[in-house]
């Protein structure tokens, strides 16, 4: 009986003890799918400015190509391209979509309302326009290295 009482006392102490953190290992599976099956689809807009949003290498990595020789655009200019590409929410819930530029001159490019975010319902699309301001830049400056398109439920 004293041994049983000691065992219960130890069990109670363990069961009521506090802890500050817990760690657990879980398995996760992430599959890459083609754009037609993705939760967000990017497509060139079906209009004249959609021609600037190109998959030059055929690898699904789109680029904004403003000249056929990829030399760039003039300095001290402002270029606005309406309706360049479309983002479609193919998921099962609404998401807030934002575009963030990565590079040295991200303040010189804007993606309209997607700079601060826009909510897309299931099946909804948004057409993205691009504004580029090269004032203050010099010949050879690279405006962006890449963009991140984020979707948060």
What are these regions, as identified by a protein language model?
Residues 25-27, 80-84, 125-127:
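Intrinsic-disorder/low-complexity, polar/charged segments enriched in Ser/Thr/Lys/Arg/Asp/Glu/Gln
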Residues 1-56:
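Short, polar/proline-rich extracytoplasmic segments that appear immediately after membrane translocation
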Residues 72-73, 114-120:
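Beta-strand-rich interaction surfaces with strong enrichment in secreted/lumenal proteins
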Residues 105-115:
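Short beta-strand and strand-turn-strand segments in soluble, beta-rich domains
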